[in-house]
Amino acid sequence: GKTVQEGGAVYNFTGPQGFGIANMADSLYAIRQLVYEEKKFTMEELKEALAWNYGKGLDEQSVKEITTGILREMTESGAKVDADTAAAVLKSVMNAQMAPEKMARYQEIHDMIAEVPKFGNDIPEVDYFARDVAYTYTRPLQNFKNPRGGQYQAGLYPVSANVPLGGQTGATPDGRYAHTPVADGVSPSAGKDVNGPTAAASSVAKLDHFIVSNGTLFNQKFHPSALSGREGLEKFVALIRSYFDQKGMHM
């Protein structure tokens, strides 16, 4: 045989991971319904609401962008910009207060988004929308080769990275507040699957798990009392069997 260094490896693939599919799907679905179909608010209003974290204040990235913009304008106008000036501008932006009517509007936008159907409730229109959204990552990846000339095989599981990644991510159009965890693997966003575990499993099973050859991960949490006794065990087994009968991958 050959060593790995001599080209003896049997498998030659790289498996990059994607996650937050539910956030992406719920965000785009909310935009389609509220901005383009019902015209409840504009994209510009939504961008402002996100920058202000739905009324909870500017997020860190927005503070940096606004501060940089102000300093750039000052420099272009010929004003002297030193470290003290930059610090003063940064402090001013961080202390900026939102007008009460703006804060109320951003909260109203958040409330409207909360009422939009979400992935994880066995609603075909939403679930197949999520399936198409996942394809925007999985299909293009097939067109590239890794540095060794092998395949890229898409994966959709976070290994808990959804928590630190969410901590670095601003507010999203699905109603998620800045710096909170994004969705875990292919699971629905936390608290958004309100029709029970069977409905959530049916939604996740509608994703194309075959194309995600590096694996998907569907996580669910149960209170022990929900699975207690013989009846609880039988229900748990039925849920798992149903998920795999629908071509789910990893639960």
Each language-model region and where it sits:
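Acidic, glycine-enriched catalytic cores built around paired aspartates
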Residues: 1-251
